C-alpha cells in the first residue's frame, strides 16, 4: 500500500478532509478524560523536525503522539547537523535509517515536505512550509468552526490580516471553500497575494466593508519576520485601520466567533477585549489542535484510505 502523507490541502478532496475531522471526534473524547493516554501507537516513533521556531505546533504534535503512546524524537535546526551544512536530503536518509515511523517537518522553504516525502518511505506531515501551507492548522480551524457552526454552507467568514505571508490563510481558503464557506479577505493591498480573488474569495480594503453579517472572523498576525520594508506605514497605523476591536466586532452577527491561529500580537491585529472576550474560541482551537493531530498521526500510521 502506498505511503500516505499530509503535505497540503490545495488538492485534497472534501471527503478526505472530512475523514481527518471525523477521526478527531473520538480523539477529543480521549483528551477530555482524566487519563488521556491510549495504546494505539505503542511501539511507533514520531520524529519532529523543525527548521523554524515553534511553540504551539511542536507541543501540539508532541502531545498528540504521547497521548497515543508513540515515542517522540524532537530535532530543532539549531541542534541538528543542518548547522554543519547537512542537506535536507541527507537528514532524510538518516531519519529513515534510524527507523522513524512518521516525520513532522516545519521548514522555511515552500515545498520542503514534498521533497522529503519523495526521499523516505514513511509518512510525512507538513507542519508549515514557508508561505505555502499549514494543513493541520486549517484542519483544526475547520474542526473548531464545525463545532460552533455545524452547517458551514453559506457561512460568511472574514479573514483579516497579513494574507500575503500567511500559510495559514492559504490552507484555510482551500479547506473552507470546499465546504461552502463564503470567505472574505481584508488586508492592505500590499499584504494581499496577486490574483487571490481567483481562489473563490471576496477581497476588501476595509474591515467595515467585510464584517457585516459575518458569522466568524479569523485574525492573522503581521508576519514581520517575513516582510520586506515599506509594506505598511507603521504598526500603529495598521492597528488603527485593521485591528479587530470591540467596535468592529459589533458589526458582525451577534453570535459570530473570533479565531486566531497564534501567536497573537495583542493591541495590533486584535484588541485585548476581543481576544479575552466571550466570542473568542482561541483556546478551543489549541485544544482541538491536539485532537486533530492525533487523528492525523493515527490515520497516516495505522488508518486506511477507503
UniProtKB/Swiss-Prot annotation:
Summary of subunit composition and partner proteins: Heterododecamer (2C3:3R2) of six catalytic PyrB chains organized as two trimers (C3), and six regulatory PyrI chains organized as three dimers (R2).
Annotated EC: 2.1.3.2
InterPro entries according to UniProt: Asp/Orn_carbamoyltranf_P-bd, Asp/Orn_carbamoylTrfase, Asp/Orn_carbamoylTrfase_sf, Asp_carbamoyltransf, Asp_carbamoyltransf_Asp/Orn-bd
List of residues binding L-aspartate: 84, 167, 221
Family named by the database record: Belongs to the aspartate/ornithine carbamoyltransferase superfamily. ATCase family.
GO CC list: cytosol
Free-text function comment from the UniProt entry: Catalyzes the condensation of carbamoyl phosphate and aspartate to form carbamoyl aspartate and inorganic phosphate, the committed step in the de novo pyrimidine nucleotide biosynthesis pathway.
Enzyme class: transferase
Keyword Membrane: no
Residues annotated for carbamoyl phosphate binding in this entry: 56-57, 106, 134, 137, 262-263
Name of the protein in question: Aspartate carbamoyltransferase catalytic subunit
PROSITE patterns noted in UniProt: CARBAMOYLTRANSFERASE
An example Gene Ontology biological process: amino acid metabolic process
Catalytic activity field: carbamoyl phosphate + L-aspartate = N-carbamoyl-L-aspartate + phosphate + H(+)
GO molecular function, one term: amino acid binding
Keywords: Pyrimidine biosynthesis, Transferase
Organism: Desulforudis audaxviator (strain MP104C)
Gene: pyrB
Pathway listed: Pyrimidine metabolism; UMP biosynthesis via de novo pathway; (S)-dihydroorotate from bicarbonate: step 2/3
Amino acid at each position: 500500500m502506498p505511503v500516505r502523507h499530509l503535505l497540503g490541502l490545495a488538492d485534497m478532496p472534501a471527503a478526505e478532509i472530512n475523514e481527518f475531522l471525523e477521526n478527531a471526534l473520538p480523539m477529543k473524547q480521549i483528551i477530555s478524560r482524566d487519563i488521556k493516554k491510549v495504546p494505539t501507537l505503542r511501539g511507533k516513533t514520531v520524529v519532529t523536525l523543525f527548521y523554524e521556531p515553534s511553540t504551539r505546533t511542536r507541543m501540539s504534535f508532541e502531545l498528540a503522539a504521547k497521548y497515543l503512546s508513540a515515542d517522540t524524537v524532537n530535532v530543532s535546526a539549531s541542534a541538528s547537523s543542518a548547522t554543519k551544512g547537512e542537506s535536507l536530503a541527507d537528514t532524510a536518509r538518516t531519519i529513515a535509517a534510524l527507523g522513524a515511523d512518521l516525520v513532522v517537518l516545519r521548514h522555511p522553504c515552500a515545498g520542503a515536505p514534498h521533497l522529503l516525502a519523495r526521499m523516505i518511505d514513511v509518512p510525512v506531515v507538513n507542519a508549515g512550509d514557508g508561505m505555502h501551507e499549514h494543513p493541520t492548522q486549517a484542519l483544526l480551524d475547520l474542526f473548531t468552526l464545525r463545532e460552533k457552526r455545524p452547517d458551514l454552507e453559506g457561512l460568511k467568514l472574514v479573514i483579516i490580516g497579513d494574507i500575503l505571508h500567511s500559510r495559514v490563510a492559504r490552507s484555510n481558503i482551500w479547506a473552507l471553500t470546499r465546504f461552502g464557506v463564503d470567505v472574505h479577505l481584508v488586508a492592505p493591498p500590499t499584504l494581499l497575494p496577486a490574483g487571490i480573488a481567483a481562489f473563490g474569495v471576496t477581497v476588501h480594503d476595509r474591515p467595515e466593508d467585510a464584517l457585516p453579517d459575518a458569522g466568524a472572523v479569523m485574525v492573522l498576525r503581521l508576519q514581520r519576520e517575513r516582510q520586506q520594508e515599506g509594506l505598511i506605514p507603521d504598526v500603529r497605523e495598521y492597528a488603527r485601520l485593521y485591528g479587530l476591536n470591540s467596535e468592529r466586532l459589533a458589526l458582525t452577527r451577534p453570535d459570530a466567533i473570533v479565531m486566531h491561529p497564534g501567536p497573537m500580537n495583542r493591541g495590533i491585529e486584535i484588541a485585548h477585549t476581543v481576544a479575552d472576550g466571550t466570542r473568542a474560541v482561541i483556546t478551543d482551537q489549541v485544544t482541538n489542535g491536539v485532537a486533530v493531530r492525533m487523528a492525523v498521526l493515527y490515520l497516516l500510521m495505522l488508518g486506511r484510505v477507503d
